[in-house]
Every structure is written in C-alpha cells, then in structure tokens.
C-alpha cells in the first residue's frame, strides 16, 4: 500500500524558478511620456513628408545710403524700369535689392501723394508665335468687319502693324509704306485679303524688348568730372605736356565739358573783377 508523504508538494510553487529559465531578476521598465508621445505622432505622420528646415537669415539687410538713393533716383529718370542698367549705374546693389527698394519707394510716393517721377509700368509682352485660331466664316462685306490697327513707331518713324484681328477684311486705306505691305501681306497696296488668306500669311507680331526701347531713347550720361578737372589742372602745370593728345583720347562728353569750362574760365578772367589776379599772374611771368 502506497502512502503519500504530505510534506512533498504535488506541483512547483509560482515563485520557484526552473533551472535555465528566468534566472535574471524581474525589473519593470517604464517608457517616458515624451518618447511615447513622439512614437504616437510618428505613427500618424506621413513618412514621405520632408522635414522643413528652420528659416535662417543668411545675410543681413544692407541699408541704403543717401548717395546710393540719389544714384537710384537719377538712374530711375534715365532708364525707367531697366533694372540691369540701374544696377550698373548704382554699382553697389544687386538687381533684387534694387527692385525691392524701387517697390518700397513707389508705395511710399503713392501713399504720400507727392509728385515724384514714377516710371510707367512695362507693357505686357505678346507671344512671338501665338496659338493659331480658326478663321470665322464671314461673308465679304465692305460695310462692316474691318481690321483695327495699332502702330508702334520706332526711331525711324515708320508705323508697324502689331495688333489683333477682329473681323474678316483688311482695310487698306491707311497710308502704310508699300515695303511693309508687301513683306507682311504679300499683296499690292490697294488690295484686300480675306481672313483665310490672312491666317495662311500671319503677320509677325512686333515685340520690342526693353533694351531696344531704351536704345531708342536719348540717355543723358554724366561726364567724368575727375578726368575733366584733372585735365584743366594740368593745363596750368608747366611740366605737363601732350594736352592735344589727351583731348583726342577723351570721350565726346568729357571733351565737350572741358571746352565749355575752359571757355567760361577765359570769359571770367577777362572780366574786370579779376584784375588783381591777372596782375598777379603777369608778375610771375615777368619774374
């Protein structure tokens, strides 16, 4: 007969560890709240979205001096809105800085209501090759359907056609040079063409760039006063020679300025107000 020993346990207790398992002491790990929130946010974010870099000012803004602003105003009178030429005239600012300064200046003038010179806005450029449109099927009638022409006058004062077509006929009573008509229309001066032939022989739209417009205008260029006064000072220096050669090598505007100043100087020296100066100069010559 088998007897059960009450001291022996039928099963292993819960706190007893098996050999080879759970040998390390149990430690509870806690995740910080910030890490858990970041993990939650990263789970819902789009993985393809790029991380935006923080905005940093790489270059500090440079204030305009009074001399630079005066040059800017003078260049605005000369070149209107040709920013590249204004940049070359000012010399110390970029095109972007000049355009930004001009925008602020225009807003300030409009707000104050002062009568300052503001250059007109640039005309919108038309396409060199506009998208072809189907010609409307109109019957030939002389009472309606005429072209409305606009003319762009260039420097040689010849009109050039450069506008849109509204109806089906071309009115040829306007005095246009025959060379322009033959080149653009391919017909004689007193002939009219329908819209279909007009589409086959489309006129080239004249678009003058800003450089061409500026070339047509007479620009005032300031003389180089350093060179002018240097030459006038060398005239009274007995050690300096070759004045005629230097005059020939000068720019026309510098040469004109030198001659004008020398003429004014000679007129002033002949006036009675400079008698003492003339006597002083003659005493040096006598000695």
Curated annotation (Swiss-Prot):
Question: Can you list the GO cellular component terms from the UniProt entry?
Answer: nucleus
Looking at the UniProt entry, the stretches that span the membrane are none
A molecular-function term among this protein's GO annotations: DNA-binding transcription factor activity
Q: Which residues form a coiled coil?
A: none
- Keyword ATP-binding assigned to the entry: answer is no
Disordered: region residues: 111-135
Could you tell me the gene encoding this protein? RVE3
Report keywords, A-Z. Answer: DNA-binding, Nucleus, Transcription, Transcription regulation
Its biological purpose: Probable transcription factor.
Q: What is this protein called?
A: Protein REVEILLE 3
Pfam families for this protein: Myb_DNA-binding, RVE6
Which residue numbers delimit the HTH myb-type domain? 56-110
Point out the DNA-binding stretch(es): 83-106
What are the subcellular locations of this protein? Nucleus
The record's InterPro entries line, in alphabetical order, gives: Homeodomain-like_sf, Myb_dom, Myb_dom_plants, SANT/Myb, SANT_dom
Q: Has the keyword Membrane been applied to this entry?
A: no
């Amino acid at each position: 007969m088998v007897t059960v020993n009450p001291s022996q346990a039928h099963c292993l207790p819960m706190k007893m560890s098996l050999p080879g398992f759970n040998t390390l002491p149990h430690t509870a790990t806690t995740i910080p709240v910030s890490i858990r929130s970041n993990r939650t946010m990263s789970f819902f974010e789009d993985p393809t979205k790029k991380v935006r870099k923080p905005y940093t000012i790489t270059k500090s803004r440079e204030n305009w001096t009074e001399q630079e602003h005066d040059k800017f105003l003078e260049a605005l009178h000369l070149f209107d809105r040709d920013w590249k030429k204004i940049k070359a005239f000012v010399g110390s600012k970029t095109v972007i800085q000049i355009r930004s300064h001009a925008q602020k200046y225009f807003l300030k003038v409009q707000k104050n209501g002062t009568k300052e010179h503001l250059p007109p806005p640039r005309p919108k450029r038309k396409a060199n090759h506009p998208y072809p449109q189907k010609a409307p099927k109109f019957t030939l009638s002389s009472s309606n359907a005429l072209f409305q022409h606009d003319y762009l006058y260039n420097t040689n004062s010849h009109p050039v056609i450069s506008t849109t077509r509204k109806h089906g006929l071309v009115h040829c009573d306007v005095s246009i040079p025959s060379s322009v008509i033959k080149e653009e229309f391919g017909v004689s001066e007193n002939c009219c063409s329908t819209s279909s032939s007009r589409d086959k022989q489309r006129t080239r739209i004249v678009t003058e760039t800003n450089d061409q417009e500026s070339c047509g205008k007479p620009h005032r260029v300031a003389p180089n006063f350093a060179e002018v006064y240097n030459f006038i000072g060398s005239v009274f220096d007995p050690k300096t020679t070759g004045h005629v050669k230097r005059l020939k090598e000068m720019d026309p505007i510098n040469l004109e300025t030198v001659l004008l100043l020398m003429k004014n100087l000679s007129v002033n020296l002949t006036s009675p107000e400079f008698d003492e100066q003339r006597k002083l100069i003659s005493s040096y010559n006598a000695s």
